[in-house]
Regions:
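Histone-fold recognition with a strong bias for associated Lys/Arg-rich disordered tails
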Residues: 1-202
Length: 202
């Protein structure tokens, strides 16, 4: 695998915009942590919450670290060019290994976060320590959310919670007596059955 999921690409782009906005020459782990935590419907805020870490507080702390990075301005610098720092590069390499280990076909946001946990730069390391985030804790909450599903598409987040959400929505709808008759929805139902049987096979 060397393909990133949509959310990983979005986070990399957001991190790059952040670095440009702050006139930072290098894309650091801190930028990436802010970008990953900012993904509203993303997996990382959800996993942080499950580790009893408030995503907003974590994001603010990471953003504070970004604001302390050296600003590079002046004629010699192309404002739109940002290179990946050594530390982030190592974390992305670790993320790729993590994806392979987990037999995933794409590098997803959880692999990137895990990569930073395994190869933290000094500043990211301080953040993880401050919030009590460890690789073990992270893997624990990740497997609770992901179950034994593998990342086989570039948009895996849509499936992780789909079943839980779908089940929940049906229960709530039944309570509120809002369930539609099932006529004409066979394609939808087939879809759910396919997802369920795939889950069993895994």
């Amino acid at each position: 695998t060397n393909q990133f999921t949509q959310k990983t690409m979005e986070a990399l782009q957001a991190a790059q915009r952040l670095a440009i906005e702050y006139s930072n020459q290098a894309l650091e782990q801190e930028h990436m942590l802010v970008a990953l935590t900012q993904q509203q419907d993303g997996l990382i805020p959800q996993l942080l919450t499950k580790m009893n870490v408030d995503p907003g507080t974590f994001e603010a702390a990471a953003a504070e670290k970004v604001s302390q990075l050296p600003h590079v301005t002046g004629s010699g610098r192309d404002p739109d060019k940002v290179y990946i720092s050594n530390e982030l590069d190592q974390a992305l390499t670790a993320a790729e290994k993590q994806a392979q280990q987990m037999k995933d076909e794409y590098i997803s946001v959880e692999h990137v976060f895990m990569g930073m946990l395994q190869r933290p730069g000094r500043v990211a390391g301080e953040l993880f320590k401050q919030f009590g985030i460890t690789p073990e804790k992270f893997m624990q909450v990740l497997s609770a959310v992901r179950g034994n599903q593998r990342v086989t598409t570039d948009n895996p987040e849509s499936t992780y919670d789909a079943l839980k959400k779908y089940g929940q929505d049906l229960v709530e709808a039944a309570r509120a007596n809002k369930l539609d008759p099932v006529i004409g929805r066979d394609s939808e139902i087939r879809n759910v059955i396919r997802i369920l049987s795939r889950k069993r096979k895994n």
